[in-house]
Amino acid sequence: MALSAEGSSGGSRGGSPKAEAASVPSWPQILGRLTDNRDLARGQAAWAMDQIMTGNARPAQIAAFAVAMTMKAPTADEVGELAGVMLSHAHPLPADTVPDDAVDVVGTGGDGVNTVNLSTMAAIVVAAAGVPVVKHGNRAASSLSGGADTLEALGVRIDLGPDLVARSLAEVGIGFCFAPRFHPSYRHAAAVRREIGVPTVFNLLGPLTNPARPRAGLIGCAFADLAEVMAGVFAARRSSVLVVHGDDGLDELTTTTTSTIWRVAAGSVDKLTFDPAGFGFARAQLDQLAGGDAQANAAAVRAVLGGARGPVRDAVVLNAAGAIVAHAGLSSRAEWLPAWEEGLRRASAAIDTGAAEQLLARWVRFGRQI
């Protein structure tokens, strides 16, 4: 068997905070609770994030909030409030332009391993398999090349606004929401986050704030202790999502060892151990997945989509299949193991038939013609 259950939960980790008398939130009140290792009262995280997004929080307050919440350990309710406020300030895609079954393939980053851009390659493969993909991403924060950097090196336009991303999704089957373009109000937190230089609760927000709001996805989390928190946020949204953490530390499904999956469906979370060997994947070495700068990673994309075999292709197929499984989970009729078998078949076929390579060419051409 490739999968074994380890437990389940119904969403938010850490329980509900104690009720407290209604009062106007303030930074001393919120920071005091966090430094006292207490969960925030309902609405306090939302207030803090709104202060940050509107430019009313000072850098010291932003930094103190991010670090204190991280040290306390955030709950799904708190992170859900942060993400909800961030989405309320985002530029949305036009109404009725995102298919109900669209998926995202994205990770938190921050695993410190600097692999090739597996989620970016997987997203292209998933779209070529016929699943609409609206990917949210950014430039590199700690690695040599983020998803946006690699797409740009491939010739994909990463700077498109909501209307053109919607057109790309409709005409090509995939669209890319460049985080700074869609979340301009986040610039206040982004600068502080760079200066802090260590992972905080803000690292969780990218995968939770896709402005297209897809209902399904494969979401990588580099932080094993926070993956369940992310899963709880998706459960509250009743999304069909696989939150994944490679047991080697990757924010992807890994082929070097087992991965842990938090399967989100129908508002609940199940924790599973996933072994790709159960589906015939050979064990890889981590250095076989190593990436480089944007040009090197773009070359790796072209090689895999062009049919090159080996550990990188295996990891891409595995992650693309995971996204297809999450997509299948939108149907109450989906069965877990058959969905994996079908996902792996479709992902492999998308590469082997040339469909993924052709989709990338169409995506590049779309950007040149607009």
UniProtKB/Swiss-Prot annotation:
Cofactor annotation remark: Binds 2 magnesium ions per monomer.
Q: State where Mg(2+) 1 binds.
A: 119, 252
Q: N-acetylalanine is carried by which residues?
A: 2
Q: Where does anthranilate 2 bind?
A: 193
Q: Which SUPFAM superfamilies does the UniProt record give?
A: Nucleoside phosphorylase/phosphoribosyltransferase catalytic domain, Nucleoside phosphorylase/phosphoribosyltransferase N-terminal domain
Task: Give yes or no: UniProt keyword Thylakoid.
Answer: no
Single GO cellular component annotation? cytosol
Any one Gene Ontology BP term: L-tryptophan biosynthetic process
Q: Where does anthranilate 1 bind?
A: 107, 138
- Binding locations of 5-phospho-alpha-D-ribose 1-diphosphate: 107, 110-111, 115, 117-120, 135-143, 147
The ranges of region (Disordered) come to: 1-27
Tell me the residue numbers annotated for binding Mg(2+) 2. 251-252
The cofactor named in the record is:
Mg(2+)
Q: How does it assemble?
A: Homodimer.
User: Which HAMAP family does the entry mention?
Assistant: TrpD
Question: What is the protein's given name?
Answer: Anthranilate phosphoribosyltransferase
